[in-house]
């Protein structure tokens, strides 16, 4: 319940709507509870004495009560819906804001599909609990108290039937809730797995078709879909036992009251109208108890969702800006002092070990290494996408942990290995680099990245729609747009993470020439092609997470065997791209 109480704090201004809705429910219930008393008067006084005036008077009063109950019920529905959907929107927004603050190490703990489920399905469960459960949560106790009270007022002996039924219903509810509670958690995890398969299959649909793996993906989907179906069936098979058991007890109570009340009517101890009114209260009380049981089941499921949402909100953010953070980076110098790094504290091996490296401001540095040599890991420590496990990373002469995160990352531009574009136009995507960039600035960045040559051929130019993930442009065009977007930031440190692999060597040469014109910008170029880095000021060779060698093209070619092997394989008829393959 602690998690659910905490999430109620996100109601904000919608608390007022819930309070008004509660008042409407109480009024609605009160109007409904008066109707059986009026009905008893019609039978026992109006019909028995053939008093038409009493019948009309009580009939009009019943109609007014019914209309007032209808009006208050409609008002309740309006206020509750506003509160439920407003609450859900606030929780989703809080989760999304929290995820935006996550470091990479935080994101590594969650699957993307799981986060989507947390923000959609789990929030919907909470909304449905308010929409479907708030009414009986308020109404049922009021109806129960008023119904039992009026029943004892009408006939204490018949009302004793409630004292027999209540323990039976309470025991059944306790058993069901205790069994169902853990099953709802498993149900939501099954939804996670289904969403993961769906997302993965749709994201990689081109690869699925290219490898003709449609049947395999269908079988995988059928597996998780069947798991979700079976988990749902097991959960709700037990949950729905609530209804037949409660109906059995309710109808048993009605039969007992009819039998006892009938005998009392025959013995003149009870009037027919009183028995009719009493039966109305019995049905209302029993229905209220059934509704309370449904509320408990709704709360049980919502608790499972609340715990999952709290996992996102309570995730400890491992990277944050310090107090009195430095807001300005003096220059683009980079230093690694005894840096070691592993992705998880419990990991046996380090991804990076004992890295010592000094890169003066304004230098262009190439980084080479085989697959798994931790090239990307190395550069991710510069903008604090991860923190070094041991040692210190310095930028501009200061420990990166002293900088304000936003200021640090604004001063470091990264062109990612995986090209990421968003739905929208070219202009909207480029302005991620500089939101207020003019068209002149956009075109200048595109020319530097050799993107202008294909954009100028497009009828809409910068207003060309890229489609979801940039599906309307080729891989090489995506790379050039990503480069242009990063150049717009005008960073002090520019990192290319194998970011020209999809462009031809001539285009790469033009981009390299444009980059050379950027003064006072430190450029780190991760590459597989030796031609991409041979003209840099220095080249760093990584091997198994360690710095193997540092030097210029000439010095490494003269004295480093790994560099010589790469050069020979790529420049003398070996592999055209990348580090030479090793035997599997």
Regions found by a protein language model. Give the residues of each.
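Transmembrane helices of ABC transporter permease
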Residues: 13, 17-30, 41, 65, ...
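Helix-loop-helix
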Residues: 51, 55-57, 150-164, 234-307, ...
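ABC-type nucleotide-binding domain
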Residues: 328-584
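Short intracellular "coupling" helices and adjacent cytoplasmic loop segments at the cytosolic face
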Residues: 49-50, 85, 93-123, 196-220, ...
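Membrane-integrated ABC transporters
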Residues: 1-32, 39, 47-62, 72, ...
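Hydrophobic/aromatic residues in alpha-helical transmembrane segments
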Residues: 35, 39, 76, 80, ...
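An intracellular "coupling" helix at the cytosolic face of ABC transporter transmembrane type-1 domains
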Residues: 13, 101-105, 121-130, 134, ...
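Hydrophobic alpha-helical transmembrane bundles that constitute the permease/transmembrane domains
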Residues: 26-34, 67-74, 126-129, 133-145, ...
